[in-house]
Amino acid sequence: MTRNKVEICGVDTAKLPVLKNEEMRKLFREMQSGEISAREKLVNGNLRLVLSVIQRFNNRGEYVDDLFQVGCIGLMKSIDNFDLGQNVKFSTYAVPMIIGEIRRYLRDNNPIRVSRSLRDIAYKA
């Protein structure tokens, strides 16, 4: 059986850990009490989430490494802003933030600039 995982940004995607929901909640509590290593474990435990999101943006002409790094920025922002008081799974909260960071990156690095008013007209048509 062959593995389809690759190394992106120096990270071997085949060896990425996956956190369970209970582990994630425990790490969020530790992070909120000030433990820095808990944040690092949360980031490392959710890198597969970033990988699954960047697959949507594969055919945009951008390097996968760049998309992965930008997705990780969105992941870190979502980890910092996540509230355990809400009854929401972390992945449900994080995916829109990761997508938003990637879209912002793609929009800002696009060589063709389209004004917002023209874009709005195009969406209405």
Swiss-Prot record:
Record InterPro entries: RNA_pol_sigma-70_dom, RNA_pol_sigma70, RNA_pol_sigma70_r2, RNA_pol_sigma_r2, Sigma-70_RNA_pol_init_factors
Keywords: DNA-binding, Sigma factor, Transcription, Transcription regulation
Gene3D superfamilies named among the record's database cross-references: 1.20.120.1810
Matches recorded under PROSITE patterns: SIGMA70_1
Superkingdom of this protein's organism: Bacteria
Annotated GO MF terms: DNA binding; sigma factor activity
Gene Ontology BP annotations: DNA-templated transcription initiation
This protein's record includes keyword Nucleus: no
Role played: Sigma factors are initiation factors that promote the attachment of RNA polymerase to specific initiation sites and are then released.
Stated family: Belongs to the sigma-70 factor family.
Protein name in UniProt: Putative RNA polymerase sigma-G factor
